[in-house]
Design a protein with these regions (language model features):
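ABC-family P-loop ATPase nucleotide-binding domains
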Residues: 3, 7-64
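Catalytic Walker B motif of ABC-type/P-loop ATPase nucleotide-binding domains
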Residues: 77-81
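Helical segment within the ABC ATPase nucleotide-binding domain
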Residues: 91-104
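Conserved H-loop
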Residues: 106-114
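A short, surface-exposed alpha-helical micro-motif characterized by mixed small hydrophobic
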Residues: 118-120
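ABC ATPase "signature
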Residues: 136-137
Length: 174
């Protein structure tokens, strides 16, 4: 069961061994793990997997762990704030790798405050608040039922904030 599930936390904490060694040892628990895919993803993300985590920046550790996670070929991939700590080119590469990874047999669950960085990858949106589930809808349903941008005074705003050009926010599409 757990060999079909992989979690990538926001902050990566790893043993102080070369990342390639970590990937080899931990990859053994995932039947779909591919060392060649790991190497390819490390190359795409410009990561030197021979380094130990303490010699890597936060963003480098995250990229290495994401390369490992994708190489495990798990059916369910949970990503917590996957773009935090990544530079712009790495975010672009991450989106490309996730798009290639996604298929009908796999589920990718992304927890993020930076929706714009992954919006092209999203099929369904779940929004949680203090009370629990605030919204669950497909992107298509949201596009049909909501409008985003400048709001008129008559608009029934779901969310609104002041900007230099007036009120910006989300309203029910009428």
């Amino acid at each position: 069961m757990f060999s079909n599930l992989l979690f990538v936390p926001e902050e990566i904490s790893l043993p102080d061994i070369p990342f390639q060694r970590f990937a080899t040892l931990t990859g053994a628990f995932y039947p779909g793990y591919s060392s060649s895919t790991f190497t390819s993803h490390c190359s795409a993300l410009q990561i030197d997997a021979s380094l130990r985590p303490r010699r890597m920046s936060m963003g480098e550790r995250k990229k290495a762990y994401i390369a490992f996670a994708l190489a495990c070929n798990a059916d369910i991939l949970l990503l917590d704030e996957p773009t935090n700590g990544l530079d712009i080119p790495s975010k672009t590469t991450l989106r490309r790798l996730l798009a290639a990874y996604a298929d009908e047999k796999r589920t990718i669950l992304i927890s993020t405050h930076q929706v714009r960085e992954v919006e092209n990858l999203i099929d369904n949106i779940i929004i949680l608040d203090e009370q629990g589930l605030a919204l669950a809808a497909t992107t298509e349903e949201l596009t049909r039922s909501l409008t985003f941008g400048s709001l008129s005074p008559a608009a029934k705003a779901i969310y609104c904030e002041s900007s230099l050009t007036g009120e910006e926010g989300i309203a029910v599409n009428t």
